[in-house]
Amino acid sequence: MLTTKPCHCKEVLKLVLSPLTQHCLVIGETTCAFYYLLEAAAASLDLSDNYMAFLYLRKASSLLGQPSAFSFYKKHKVKICQFEEATFCCLRSEVCFNMGQITLAKKLARQALRLLKRNFPWTWFGVIFQTFLEKCWRSCSLSQPPDNPSENKKKLAVLQQQVQCLSLLWQLYNLEATASSRRFARLATLMQENSAKESASEAQVVSTYVALSQFSQNMGDKEKWLHCEQMAIQKNSLCWFSREGLLATAQLMQALAYTKLCLGHLDSSIRLGFQAREICRHLKKPALENLVLSVLFRSAFLKKKFDLCVHVLESQWALISEGHDVLGLACFYSACLDLLLYGKGWLCRPFGECLHFIQHYEHSCILNSQSNVMLGVHSSLAMWFAQDSQWKLFEHHYSKAHQLVKRTNASLFGSHGFVRFLECHVLMLQKMPEGVFAHTASETPRQTLKYFKEFFSRCVTCPVYHQWVSELKASVMRYGKRESMSLTNVIRPFDTCLTRIWIEGEFLEENNSFEGNLQRFVRVADVKENKDEEEIQECIC
């Protein structure tokens, strides 16, 4: 199946680009040295080595006459073209994004787009106006006849760089769960889609549709989510015979595994995940492979295949342990905590190691910007301390999770974190009469049920958790009537409920369409909400 040659970027970087850079610096060819530094930084990012990319860009910045990698001076010592300057800004934006410097990353991405003749607005009025232009003027420009071949080559490079900058922008704005950020993110995805179509590169179009599918799922837009995925599948048939096409195929298979997981098709998700991982290993794409492994773990975990979970985590550890990927390690330790809590004795990393990592890095810029991941981490830590009746530590991590829940979205990590938070909240409600909490305000079942309503309205594109959350909600309803609940059922939910969710067509049919399944879940959720509202009124009375 894999007919293209494997990637040799690491060898090229070590044996070609780095020596060429040093050679040009020694002989005083600063312009050439700057070019090779950009190439080396891009290769490092492609290999998921953000630290080396930062060092290359800092050296390139010094050639331009800037005292640091992230300051701005209009006059440069080295003469570079506008496209190279835009590439420089785009690479710095990506490095800042990976380092958690979100505001600076946005500024650099905007600067790169301005240099590429593609301005991105700053205000809500500008967003409205630019959206109108993208839907009208840009669609007209896509039908214009192509230029001569030499101009096309330059234009293609500019368009590809625009796509990269716009992809960074929507990911940056997607980290913030505000209405304003969502507007900016939606505009960035629209502009990215238009630039990708204008480039006429099938691989670029497929990658863009995969990205748009991911964004729509995060925003809870089920129709756009499945539409973009379907478009990516249709376009992907032309992409198999190139390296870029194979990478786009790997991205698509990862997205399909993600979708199958969100919808509850766990066996299909696992199968697609292993296929995507095979391509990632062939292409030597560690970042994408790590993402695939995260999806694989979650599918195996919900399927209750804990031996496979350990195997996946060991593979993930081999990928990220030698680098400086703090976010990757946070996702890894979050998965380890899940296995410790609900894995029935299976272990990958001890609790002390997980706790030490979180305590060491939780205040870093990188993790501060990742609310979805940290919500799950703090909620899992709270549940662990609850098992040992360490209520002060439970309260400490629960309060941190409580601050994060409003800042999350419908992504897989966001939905998973929300589920963990609901488990903590129900447990806290049950323990409240015992007076074990010193700094937490009293909660009523009615207040707790508001969180369940928010979950179902926000996480509509992640129905794999809906069954368990519905049962957890029912326990709150019963508690509101009887003022009694079993602590064991809250602490060990996977033993009774979650492991039964959508196993081999129990609630989902593997052959059903995505749209049909989602519509079915929406109808079920609506019925449950109506019934629950009636029961709430009974509790109040």
Predicted regions and their residues:
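Hydrophobic, small-residue-rich alpha-helical packing segments that form membrane-like cores
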Residues: 190, 197, 209-325, 329
